[in-house]
Amino acid sequence: IIHTQEFANADYTGNPVNRCYYCKHELFTRLEPIAVEGGFAVLAYGENASDIGDHRPGAEAAKLFEVRAPLKEAGLAKGEIRALTASLGLPTADKPQMPCLSSRIPYGQAVTPGKLAMIEQAEGVLRDAGFSEVRVRHHEQPGGALAKLELGQAEMERFVGEEMMANVAAQFREAGFTDVTLDTRGYRRGSLNEGVALAKG
């Protein structure tokens, strides 16, 4: 287990648009001496062909440390990786995507352990209720925190029942959220990056 210290870095906790750079920089800083000590010539990480064109500041840290991305280099996208792992009988074939919880917080709003705990607890509520494609976005607002839910389109109809919504809202309040809303556009990978893409033109 590698213990990283990104929360000690204000550049990370301030949550700028290149937050992932500071996270990966911290990780590779810790891994590099371990690789040298173990006699490993190359460090690798999990970027793949589906990530090409997305907002990926962590890739800049990988370039700085000369960390390889073999899945991307082989041209393998997420669907192909899942198919390959299924053919090999690996248990990760159907594992839901689990990007960093900090990606649920809008840029410019501070990343804190408390917020991440709220997000993790809230997403656990939805998964325990049988939802598979879920994201809970944490938005600061006057007087508390808003949870914006993104669910897969196929699962949204099941959510909007009165009893389900009431139960989820109650458990989200227990997690620390004051308000809960459903994004009717459904789950969108990297939805908080949409403003970054627009800014880039």
Regions found by a protein language model. Give the residues of each.
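Peripheral terminal appendages
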Residues: 39, 117, 122-201
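Short, electropositive alpha-helical surface patch
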Residues: 55-62, 110-113, 198-201
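Mid-to-C-terminal catalytic subdomains of enzymes
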Residues: 72, 76, 82-126, 131-135, ...
